[in-house]
Amino acid sequence: MNRRNFMKLSSAALSSALITNPLDLLGMPMNTPGFTKADFGPDFKWGIAASAYQIEGAWNEDGKGPSIWDTFTHNKPHKIRNKHNSDMSYDFYHNYKEDIAMIKKLNFEVFRFSFSWSRIFPEGIGRVNQKGIDFYHRVIDRCLELGVEPWALMYHFDLPQALEDKGGWANRDVINWFDEYTHKVTTEYGDKVKTWFGQNEPIGFTLGGYLAMYHAPGYFAPQKFLKAIHHALMCQAS
């Protein structure tokens, strides 16, 4: 089955689930017959969440630099089930218009996406990749065009490899690197995006990446882990 057919079938199935039984999507029991979306109240936001590495593909296109997950999956494929990687993934980079239209068709109100740090800063800091900047403008504009609220996450596990080569999250300089990166994206898109998130699960990318070895960069380094989690929290505070 090709990507388009899979996405269409998935969308149809999910749409049906939303209409008839929304809590099934969360794996929760339904105890109230007739429970509907409206019962959550007018202020509850229904949305879709995704991360750059998981959906974008185009891992080395249009000036993007490698992330630690590119390196991890290429150099340690045995760490990944079936040796998969996200070099192409869902190819959101080339199909974002259609994919966001599917979100709208499913009657979701919000699309929470993440920026690829190394698509915007190929070396992590310094030089800005204008093609990366332009891509996220197109994504955000497509959301606004269709009435889908864009929520932006600044970091979802995919540190630029150039910064990992300098010590990554275990290097205290990451606080300044993160500040430079987040300042750029918030000033660039702040007039369009009103809801922002700093990091996805800091314990996940620090513990998994620097101690448990199941996330990029895949180290067993207790001292690095302790520094990394401290620096990640410092970045949140900054």
Where are the language model's segments positioned?
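Aromatic- and Gly/Pro-rich amphipathic surface segment
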Residues: P66-A101
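Glycine-rich anion/phosphate-binding loops
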Residues: D87-K97, G126-F135, R172-E180
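Short glycine/proline-rich turn/loop motifs
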Residues: P77-D87, S116-F121, P217-F220
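Short gly/ser/thr-rich secondary-structure transition/capping motifs
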Residues: M28-T32
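Aromatic-lined substrate-binding rim segments of carbohydrate-active enzymes
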Residues: I100-Y155
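N-terminal export signals
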Residues: N5-G27
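Active-site region of glycoside hydrolase catalytic domains
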Residues: P33-H74, E123-G124, H137-S238
